[in-house]
Amino acid sequence: ALFSLPALFQVKNKFIEILESDVVDFPGLWLVKNGQSFQSEHPQKALETKAGPCYYEQYVTKRASYIAETTGNRNYPWRIFAIADQEKELITNQLVYLLATPAVEDDYSWIQPGLATLDWWGRRNIYGTDFTGGVNTETHKYFVDFNSRYGLKYFVLDDGWSDACDLKKVNENLDLNELSRYAQERQVGLVFWVHAYALKQDVSGYLDFLQSVGAKGIKVDFFNRDDQDAVNLFHQIASEALKRKIVIDFHGI
């Protein structure tokens, strides 16, 4: 069995959480069950990939015999063993943040934490209205109204708001400019689902477009990897999003 981090173990009367921090230009760490114990493993560097339909998936078809190509004069990721008497104590553990490279920016006041709704299931189950539920302006305004009424910070437009291959090809039933105006008036932030490998084709261009239609965040899905190339893509997306003050939910890693 293969396990990604964070991983939590109970050893007698203690809880041990294994984490990592400062993973830059390097693959993530996995745990492999080996009998009664676990051993660590890194995904090897991808040499060749094969794209699925419209970049909806990207499969590694050939890997190297090594895990990374990087410089020797650098720091490598921290491995953390967080130990607690009770599970709840791990929630406030700050080691991941304390061991990470300090942030390049000093103002993150624009990042507003908050609860979100999304339309993935809900848009299929809206009844008793004068419109048909689905991926359309009326349904999304309905969600925005719900958020505004109950003080929920974000509304996530999930898969279907655009073409999966080209994020600029917006669903013809959706007026993003009108929705953005409507959401802004009600102080609800719009978060857009994007496929990682569609976004990869033009990270800065697509983020410029999303910013222009009022995006406050993106939900990035279907990386399905954390080898060196994937980790570098995480950082590229995060860096470009930071420039535009767009928050990120890295969803499918």
Describe each model-derived feature in a short phrase:
Residues A1-A103:
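N-terminal accessory beta-strand-rich subdomains and adjacent acidic, glycine-rich linkers
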Residues G28, L90, Y127, K200-D202:
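Short acidic, gly/pro-rich beta-turn/loop elements at beta-sheet edges
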